[in-house]
């Protein structure tokens, strides 16, 4: 099981709250649970693997990835942006690169992801473990598989 870096107390090292439709708290060194939803047609199993590969490609360069679960209509990620990269910049990169490459693969154009993502700062080891369990079981919950460890969209360090 991945280990949480250190407990987070609300207010410590906050660098601001931004708001569009959802509030987004930025905190240096924080671990985030993020959900991004598709605006386009659902991903095929092969495309799920493709998007997973795009997210894995940024690990250790732009963010430290703890876990991801790519579903046909959304993805969840547990990650910590690397120094010099905000969560906003990381998500823009993940969604932008995956959209361009998937649109090229599909021979289509347009936005793949909804503009805004949901994010939450993970506060402690217990919450980290709860989020990993939720992500792991997500494909079982929606009926995509009975064996979550073999689902193509799953990755955990």
What residue ranges belong to the model's regions?
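Short catalytic/metal-binding and nucleic-acid-binding patches
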Residues: 1-157
